[in-house]
């Protein structure tokens, strides 16, 4: 138990380092940061900030199968996939602990009735984002903030976690495009505190590949 606890603490520590590394670089030379802010367009040259790609979901208990049926066995997908155990379903309510939430978006993808939603990551918005890049470039890459660790290029879709793309979204992507790959360096998921993300995206992709007969490319370098 102590070994697992230490391993989880290592994950948290590494994630925190990645989330704040760019902020620390700015703080180390505040004069340069100030001069830069006066001479450049902040919208185009803003430093990479992982939190810009993340968002705490909101919930609608009226859509929840578990709340509607009053039975715990009706559905537990969000509870099973949440890496922070920050979702509570009780007395016809669905609550997210904002302080514990990792903003990974896995609950959004897992819920079959769209109980969870975010402003920037609706199913339609996610598909459209991929479609624009796949239509405009020879190759499109879907990745996460930890794997990319920089501002995405035009053909790169940066998500909180690749696991926030549901099987339905992958089905639509594979039906319409054959130039979409996942970019995740070897071992990047092993060091992530979103511990359920790798299983989530592999299952979603495998399901969509079975439905379509197409395959998703994987880039690890």
Where is each model-derived feature located?
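Flexible, charged surface loops at secondary-structure boundaries
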Residues: 131-137, 151-154, 174-176
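Cofactor-cradling patches in redox/metallo enzymes
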Residues: 160, 164-165, 169-212, 216
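ABC transporter nucleotide-binding domain
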Residues: 99, 121-139
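Short, charged N-terminal beta->alpha structural module
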Residues: 109, 115-116, 141-153
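Ferredoxin-type iron-sulfur electron-transfer modules and their immediate structural context
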Residues: 1-81, 85, 137-149, 221
């Amino acid at each position: 138990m102590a070994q697992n606890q230490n391993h989880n603490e290592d994950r948290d520590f590494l994630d925190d380092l990645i989330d704040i590394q760019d902020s620390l670089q700015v703080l180390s030379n505040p004069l340069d940061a100030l001069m830069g802010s006066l001479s450049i367009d902040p919208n185009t040259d803003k430093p990479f900030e992982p939190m810009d790609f993340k968002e705490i979901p909101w919930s609608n208990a009226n859509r929840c199968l578990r709340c509607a049926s009053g039975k715990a066995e009706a559905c537990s997908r969000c509870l099973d996939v949440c890496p922070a155990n920050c979702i509570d379903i009780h007395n016809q309510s669905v609550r997210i602990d904002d302080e514990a939430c990792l903003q990974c978006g896995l609950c959004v993808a897992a819920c079959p009735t769209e109980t969870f939603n975010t402003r920037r990551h609706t199913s339609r918005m996610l598909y459209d984002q991929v479609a624009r890049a796949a239509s405009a470039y020879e190759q499109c890459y879907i990745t996460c903030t930890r794997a990319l660790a920089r501002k995405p290029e035009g053909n790169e879709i940066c998500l909180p976690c690749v696991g926030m793309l549901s099987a339905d979204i992958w089905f639509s992507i594979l039906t319409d495009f054959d130039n979409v790959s996942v970019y995740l360096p070897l071992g990047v998921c092993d060091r992530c505190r979103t511990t359920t993300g790798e299983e989530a995206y592999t299952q979603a992709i495998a399901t969509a590949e079975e439905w379509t007969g197409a395959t998703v490319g994987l880039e690890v370098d």
